[in-house]
Amino acid sequence: PYRGIVEGFYGTPWSHEDRLSMIGFCGDVRMNTYIYAPKDDSKHRDQWRELYDDAEEAKLTELIHACAENNVRFVYALSPGLDFRFTADGYEADFEALMAKYDSLYRLGVRDFALLLDDLPDRTAQAAIKSR
């Protein structure tokens, strides 16, 4: 069973040090999962097609290693629903962008991924996406 924390909230964001501390806490209390989905990471949601730069990759790698050291599964969650094109005219390009993003994270050591399609402003679009 999964026992852990989802960092996927609105409000005051966690610092990198806060994240490392939370991962240590997870290990201390035998939680086994940390889901990275911070709303303040624009490359998680608003600019999801963009790859992380070297400095951002270094921080993610540090989180991944901290999780491994604490027996905590690191799950990278991506939230592309605001502008992912689910229609024929844009689907292939967006699917390729999604795979490029996941491939770049896989190279960093991420082995568990989540695709978040919640918090969409248009409930009709959210229903259409979930039914695919």
Regions from the PLM with identified roles:
Residues 1-111, 116-118:
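Feature activates predominantly on carbohydrate-active enzymes
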